[in-house]
């Protein structure tokens, strides 16, 4: 399912501020002290996973969450890990943290992966193994870069085509590796802003406003493009340069939480306190 002409209520073109607003689920940067997925976990009581070396902002907060990423080429041997655990017996906090890390490592079971060969497909294989474990996380977040195509963007080939192909292969990998869990999974691909309608002088595009949001999953009512299309004529563009947003990305995210995780209106207000009046997008799931 694809939603087009989607944007945020915050219309700055700064990567940093726009990413903060998107991950906080707020209306301005640093307005909240937690991420909207973490507030979701506080509502559901589940556990979250950041596929990163440290917690992504979207999962930061009081809700239970942990971090995981594929191991580097020179991972510690089990015998060394056991020795370190013995050394830390006198420090319960450190010993508990290490034991938790080893538990996550064992669940992922991708320990032979080298840093050099770490593709998004390999990362998603490990992520899927964690998600399909019964006692594993309920929610996961992954940050994919490479979309800031100020130069040599290309069309059917080039930088943009490569990152889209990688995303496509990654989603296909996730679907395969999740197995039957895919039927109860929703994957949301969102971005902080789009690109300019016209190319720049370097064969790329600059920071824009509206873009597209993709939803995948076994229960998604797929095969549809949903948009209140604003047009691409000069007088239709936002500030004369960007695709104009006609749908708030938070409405789509609210719809996912409402239909997939069955959050009520008061709970949605707790997750997105700055967007209480925004109605959720409906009829996302079959």
Task: Please place each PLM-identified region on the residue numbering.
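Feature for exported/extracytoplasmic and membrane-associated proteins, marking the mature portion
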Residues: 1-180, 212-215, 219, 224-286
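Metal-dependent active-site segment of extracytoplasmic phospho-/sulfohydrolases and closely related
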Residues: 171, 175-202
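Histidine-centered active-site microenvironments of extracellular/periplasmic hydrolases
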Residues: 193-224
């Amino acid at each position: 399912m694809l939603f087009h002409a989607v944007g945020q209520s915050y219309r700055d073109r700064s990567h940093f501020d726009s990413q903060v607003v998107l991950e906080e689920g707020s209306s301005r940067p640093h307005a909240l002290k937690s991420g909207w997925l973490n507030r979701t976990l506080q509502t559901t009581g589940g556990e979250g996973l950041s596929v990163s070396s440290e917690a992504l902002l979207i999962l930061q907060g009081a809700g239970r969450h942990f971090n995981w990423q594929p191991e580097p080429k020179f991972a510690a041997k089990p015998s060394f890990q056991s020795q370190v655990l013995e050394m830390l017996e006198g420090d319960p906090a450190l010993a508990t943290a290490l034991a938790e890390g080893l538990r996550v490592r064992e669940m992922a079971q991708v320990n032979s992966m080298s840093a050099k060969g770490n593709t998004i497909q390999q990362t998603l294989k490990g992520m899927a193994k964690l998600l399909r474990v019964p006692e594993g996380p309920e929610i996961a977040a992954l940050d994919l870069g490479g979309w800031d195509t100020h130069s040599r963007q290309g069309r059917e080939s080039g930088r943009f085509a490569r990152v889209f192909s990688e995303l496509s292969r990654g989603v296909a990998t996730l679907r395969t590796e999740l197995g039957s869990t895919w039927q109860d999974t929703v994957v949301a691909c969102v971005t902080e802003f789009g690109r300019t309608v016209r190319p720049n002088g370097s064969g790329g595009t600059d920071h824009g406003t509206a873009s597209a949001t993709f939803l995948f999953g076994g229960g998604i009512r797929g095969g549809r493009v949903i948009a209140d299309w604003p047009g691409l004529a000069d007088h239709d563009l936002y500030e004369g340069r960007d695709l104009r947003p006609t749908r708030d990305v938070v409405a789509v995210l609210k719809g996912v939480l409402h239909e997939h995780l069955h959050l009520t209106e008061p709970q949605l207000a707790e997750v997105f306190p700055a967007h209480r009046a925004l109605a959720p997008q409906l009829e996302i799931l079959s």
